[in-house]
Design a protein with these regions (language model features):
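Hinge/lid segment of periplasmic solute-binding proteins
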Residues: 106-160, 182, 211-214, 300-306, ...
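Short, solvent-exposed loop/beta-turn-alpha elements that line the ligand-binding surface or hinge
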Residues: 119-135, 177, 205, 222-244, ...
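Extracytoplasmic "Venus flytrap"/periplasmic binding protein-like
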Residues: 68-136, 169-174, 271, 275-279, ...
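C-terminal lobe and pocket-closing loops
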Residues: 285-297, 310-421, 459-460
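Glycine-centered hinge/linker elements that transmit conformational signals in sensory
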Residues: 187-190, 230-261, 302, 306
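Short, well-ordered beta-strand elements
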Residues: 41-52, 73-78, 101
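N-terminal secretory signal peptides
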Residues: 1-12, 23-25
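Extracytoplasmic/periplasmic solute-binding protein
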Residues: 31, 145-154, 159, 183-234, ...
Length: 460
């Protein structure tokens, strides 16, 4: 979001804000109840967020709170890639200068929570509204540990199957929403054969997070897991389900771009937006970029829940339940951050601006926002209503992630797994080294066992 747009956004009429809050019964929680004494604190409140305009929108809302309640404070966003958060936080804690608020993806949030580095936020849940969550989710999906909530929802963001429907119709392919893995494989093969200048399908295969996330969805759809949450996170990776998921990736590889073994987030988006693939796994950013750079591709692309596994019928995505967490140590602004966060989380106008800042990538987490008529005041609701609904709502029934595999239990080891690229390396053993999937599964299981043994303290 540009500086001008943020400035304009900060000049909301107070009557509009109050009207929106009154409609959801949240005026008191947002700080419009009995007057409170202003904070006399001064300084800069450091807020970490991953690259993206939505962090800036949230901070603009917090600065609106500060203007009224803590005029000596200024909230400032610092963009930090999520996989750099843990190392930088350890460095900043050692220097006694941590950020005061962090928006981060769920795997690292779960690790910080289990490490005891965060402030509990159970009382904020009550102020924000415990019963506001959209259907199909629970507060603990964002982060609860040993009976306490540590993470406040920012958004959820699933990766889905993106399909060029113009190509699908031209080649007589069936409805992608009805596909299973065999149908997806056949569609990728058909496109590659009949469109020699275009890959049939694209996912990341490089040694990076994107590959981790893409493969995890296939692993979970097959019924496989890294760890068994019900058995104190014993390693469960050396399984027929892991072998099946790895085999499927190997079968898809001939119909992917030749450089896919190096691909990460950017390259997958590039391949789709530039017309070098007809299908891809990705989050909503692809559509946002296509709308700006490649209108015909944007108009032709629709998002679908993932192809079903032929046996389990599961169609899991990797859904990041991204949230806000408050570092507990050497944080001089805990009280002010808590108040500002409640203000942002209970202000309908700001929450809608947050979602609109990167459509349809950051999905609303509260029912009153998801159902608000104002949310539909965005061009994508006219041009891509079914796709937006899939990202925002129907994907939730198929949510999974490495931080909460099959939603069976928060995993404090996931961030460490991603830090070592265990899943991506396992995939590369198959697609680059031509290792048998069975042997690759055993290799990955050993790596996961090492992680569990070295970090057993996190399991309590």
């Amino acid at each position: 979001m540009t500086k001008d747009k943020l400035t304009d956004a900060m000049h909301l009429r107070r009557r509009e804000v109050l009207g929106g809050l009154a409609a959801t019964g949240l005026a008191t929680a947002a700080g419009f109840g009995p007057a409170k004494a202003q904070s006399t604190r001064t300084g800069v409140v450091r807020v970490w967020g991953e690259p993206g305009p939505y962090g800036g929108v949230a901070v603009a809302a917090m600065n609106e709170w500060a203007q009224k309640n803590a005029p000596g404070l200024k909230f400032e966003i610092e963009s930090i890639p999520w996989d750099g958060v843990y190392v930088k936080l350890m460095t900043d804690l050692a220097a006694r200068r941590p950020p005061s608020l962090i928006s981060v993806e769920s795997p690292i949030a779960m690790q910080l929570m289990a490490e005891g580095l965060l402030t509990p936020v159970d009382d904020l849940v009550e102020k924000i509204g415990r019963n506001r969550l959209v259907d199909g989710v629970k507060w603990e999906y964002w982060g609860a540990w040993k009976g306490q909530q540590f993470i406040i929802p920012a958004h959820h963001q699933p990766h889905l199957l993106l399909v060029r429907m113009d190509i699908a119709k031209e080649l007589g392919l069936s409805d992608p929403d009805a596909w299973d893995w065999n149908d997806l494989l056949n569609a990728a093969k058909t496109i590659s054969q009949k469109k020699p200048d275009m890959a049939g399908f694209c996912m990341a295969l490089g040694r990076n997070l994107c590959t981790d996330y893409h493969f995890a969805a296939l692993l979970h759809s097959a019924g496989g897991r890294m760890f068994d949450a019900a058995n104190r996170f014993e390693v469960a990776f050396d399984s027929p389900q892991t072998v099946e998921a790895l085999t499927f990736v190997k079968e898809l590889q001939p119909f992917m771009p030749k450089g896919a073994v190096e691909y990460s987030f950017l390259q997958v988006v590039d391949a789709h937006v530039t017309g070098r693939t007809a299908m891809s796994f990705y989050w909503g950013r692809t559509l946002g970029r296509a709308a700006e750079e490649a209108k015909p591709i944007f108009e032709a692309t629709e998002a679908f829940n993932h192809a079903r596994h032929p046996t389990t019928k599961r169609r899991n995505n990797w859904n990041d339940f991204q949230g806000w967490c408050i570092p507990a140590q050497n944080n001089p602004f805990i009280d002010e951050v808590r108040q500002a966060l409640v203000y942002q989380q209970t202000n309908k106008d700001w929450l809608i601006k947050y979602c609109h800042s990167l459509m349809p990538n950051v999905a609303p987490t509260y029912r009153d926002i998801a159902d608000a008529p104002e949310l539909q005041n965005h061009p994508f609701y006219k041009s891509k209503p079914r796709t937006v609904d899939t990202y925002f709502k129907t994907s939730l029934a198929h949510s999974s992630s490495t931080a909460n595999e099959m939603l069976q239990g928060v995993n404090p080891l996931a961030g460490i797994v991603h830090g070592r690229s265990v899943l991506a390396q396992t995939v590369q053993k198959v697609v680059i080294d031509n290792m048998k999937p069975q042997d690759a599964a055993k290799w990955g299981a050993k790596e996961l066992s090492d992680i569990r043994r070295e970090n057993i303290r996190l399991l309590g």
